[in-house]
A protein has these predicted regions:
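Short, solvent-exposed secondary-structure boundary/capping segments
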Residues: 38-46
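Intrinsically disordered, low-complexity, charged/polar segments
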Residues: 49-129
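Short beta-strand-centered aromatic/proline hotspots
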Residues: 26-36
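Short coil-to-beta transition motif at edge beta-strands of beta-rich domains
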Residues: 5-22
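Short, structured beta-strand/loop micro-motifs enriched in basic residues and often containing a Trp
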Residues: 1-3
Length: 129
């Protein structure tokens, strides 16, 4: 699914959950601060949700825990407000998931891959105006 670029009518507020969509993945993050003059959003990633192309028996997305990872400073235009109804089930899935020792490393790799794909797809959004 391609991200729709809609000029930000309302500025995001601190602690608001936002979503950055790209293809079959969604990054959910908490807003820390917005630099309105530069249209940059400082966010703290919470989770990355990936929907499989082939439906599985559970139809639940794969969820990666990003709460121990790095923050991002990215263009506001890439984000949209996240709905409670979409975030809460993912957070529940995240909390009930088995904690394997290598899960943080896998989550970090998936996050890095996602960030690189988004950057490649929307390079023009990162150009200084």
């Amino acid at each position: 699914m391609e991200q729709a670029f809609i000029p930000s009518i309302s500025v995001f507020q601190p602690h608001q959950i936002v979503c950055l969509e790209h293809e079959m993945s969604c990054l959910y993050a908490e807003v820390v601060q917005v630099a309105t003059k530069r249209q940059i959003c400082w966010v703290r990633p919470l989770l990355l949700s990936e929907t499989l192309v082939a439906p599985s028996e559970s139809d639940r997305p794969i969820v990666y825990d990003l709460r121990q990872g790095a923050d991002l400073l990215w263009p506001v235009s890439l984000f949209r407000p996240a709905l409670d109804t979409e975030v809460i089930p993912l957070l529940v899935q995240l909390e009930t998931a088995d904690r394997e020792p290598e899960s943080f490393q896998i989550a970090r790799q998936q996050f890095n891959c996602f960030i690189q794909q988004v950057w490649q797809a929307y390079k023009s959004e990162f150009q200084a105006s």
